[in-house]
């Protein structure tokens, strides 16, 4: 009997975290264009990170994280604006690599950790390939007219803020906005933004860049948007523009802006629940969500 009583004893209670409900005073008044992806990915993790300011613990890794890797690439690539007419691949590559070396020396000193050295070798290969693609672009009539252009534009009660990596103008007057991407695999803009079978937006970055440019330069005419991909497989380095014409005939640009308005309305209304399911190895908040049941509960007023 004693044994059965022991076996029937309840499991020890697990302490669970219940974050405070959204305080209207803490809701963001400004949103970066890239923040929309975070909300679409998981409203509740957006709330933890961008409203409550929670951050995952630093594991002390001695390597460059993806954001830092991208920053180094951006800093080097920004120097192309100083020589808009230059179309010599070797000279362009030398310029990019010299700027990278200067930044690395400042950030890591003369002896970077071995993991960083390996990453920098990959980045050098990507920048050399970028020089080739950029040279082709110049020969085709494109010129850089702006890099790292900051913006702040009103959008349905909030401010959209951010920086546009690069704006090009063609000899015939066409404009395009390019976002540098250093993900290992080359990215197709429409695939990274929209899932047609589900009619689901998973990112709004490029449509919002187009909207921002139209607001800031209403007389400039239509502007294309796309990625300048710098993938690990350097042979696939390329510029990829986003096509807003859906097979159904729908104008995906208008649909993207409508979804962006919905996101802003949800944030302003304090809608951050429920959390999305994510793989633990891709979740910076895995400690909170990885348990069964999760260690986190829906925010509610006391």
Predicted regions mapped to residue ranges:
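RecB-family 4Fe-4S metal-dependent nuclease core
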Residues: 1-302
